[in-house]
Design a protein with these regions (language model features):
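A metal-dependent hydrolase signature that marks the N-terminal structural subdomain at the beginning
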Residues: 104, 117, 124-257
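Active-site scaffold of zinc-dependent metalloenzymes
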Residues: 243-283, 290-297
Length: 375
């Protein structure tokens, strides 16, 4: 912009000839009093001004009208600003009044953050004070992790690093493994070891309480004395005589009397259970084997494998359900989901029959007809 004194220029503002000083700006000449702000219409004079769409503005008027306004204090924003949900904010207004605050330290969150249970956290605050810790290595669980049946949280990679307890499915890291265990023995976690049935007196106390429970469900044993044995895996395999696989945990002890190669009678002597089972599983195995014993005592022979094993699994399942503790619910779920065509599918078929008929009627029909009720 320049001020000049010449002859008869025409003012763009009023269209009249200019006598005296005038302004040359925006490619035109102006009376000084006619070169005005497009907003307030007051002369701009020789001060700094802004141009927008070919129109002049006082700098203050320009910023007041054209600059974004802070959605919090409603004042114009002339420098850097933050946007949030389509609104603009002064940095200080945003940080003090708008930005999310860490649920732990209550300071503004300006960068990346974690959300947990609808609350926001600084990454460091979440990592150091909020994130769950791996039950095995203690590291904060910041990404995908595993939660097992027991609610134990741990790093996903540990699934391929540590063996699982043979009885409850918990992972067993090296520091929790039994140092004296033979390589042929199953891995047990500290929880299962803590309740393991290792001695016959222990076992007998628990076993004695089972028969009254089964009697109350209509399974009579006629006061026949049933012995209980605790055996190792080698002895259990001998007693099974190849009748079951390596996963067997118990066996019914029977004596078969034959005449002229014909079975004349079968006697039940008791049951044998693998030593070292956790107490809840021990009881469930005992109930299963007592199911086999009851079938023999009632003279029920020749059932299909799925029917006999399914019936015995049903007894264990009902026992676990009545016990209704974490361990029993875990074992009951294992029975429900067992993919084995004999034990798993057998249980599901027998369970459906018993549900349809009612358990007491189902047992009585089985006892009197000596065969599995029709599906």
């Amino acid at each position: 912009m320049s001020m000049a004194r010449t002859s008869q220029p025409v003012c763009k503002g009023c269209g009249q000839s200019i006598n005296g000083y005038y302004l040359t700006v925006l490619g035109a000449t102006w009376h000084p009093e006619h070169f005005v702000c497009a907003i307030c219409h007051q002369p701009i004079g020789d001060t700094q001004f802004n141009i927008h769409d070919g129109k002049p503005y006082h700098t203050e008027c320009y910023h007041d009208r054209m600059d974004p306004r802070c959605a919090y204090c409603h004042k114009s924003i002339t420098g850097q600003y933050y946007t949030h949900n389509g609104a603009a904010y002064h940095p200080e207004c945003y940080q003090e009044h708008i930005v999310s605050r860490c649920e732990y330290c209550h300071k503004p969150i300006m960068g990346q953050y974690y959300t947990h249970e609808s609350a926001s956290y600084h990454t460091a605050c979440y990592r150091d004070h909020v994130a769950p810790r791996c039950a095995y290595c203690g590291k904060p669980l910041m990404s995908e992790y595993v939660v097992d049946h027991w609610g134990t949280k741990y790093c996903k990679e540990h699934q391929s690093q540590y063996p699982k307890c043979a009885y409850c499915g918990r992972l067993v890291p090296p520091q929790q493994q039994e140092q004296a265990a033979m390589s042929s023995e199953r891995v047990r976690c500290p929880f299962c070891r803590a309740s393991a049935i290792e001695s016959l007196p222990q076992a007998r106390i628990l076993f004695q309480g089972l028969l009254p429970q089964l009697n109350a469900q209509g399974l009579q044993y006629n006061n026949i004395p049933l012995q209980l044995e605790l055996v190792d895996r080698v002895r259990l395999a001998q007693l099974l005589h190849g009748r079951s696989g390596a996963d067997a945990l118990g066996v019914t002890l029977q004596s078969t009397h034959m005449l002229n190669k014909q079975i004349v009678r079968t006697e039940v002597n008791g049951i044998a259970v693998l030593r070292g089972l956790p107490s809840t599983l021990f009881l469930g195995v005992c109930v299963h084997e007592l199911g086999h014993a009851w079938l023999t005592l009632q003279g029920i022979q020749g059932l299909a494998s799925w029917a006999e094993e399914g019936f015995c699994e049903l007894l264990s399942y009902r026992f676990y359900g009545k016990l209704n503790i974490d361990e029993s619910r875990h074992h009951a779920e294992g029975i429900e989901k067992n993919p084995d065509p004999v034990y798993g599918e057998g249980f599901r078929r027998v369970h459906a029959m018993a549900d349809r008929m009612g358990f007491q009627r189902f047992v009585e029909t089985l006892r009197t007809t000596k065969r599995m009720p029709s599906a």
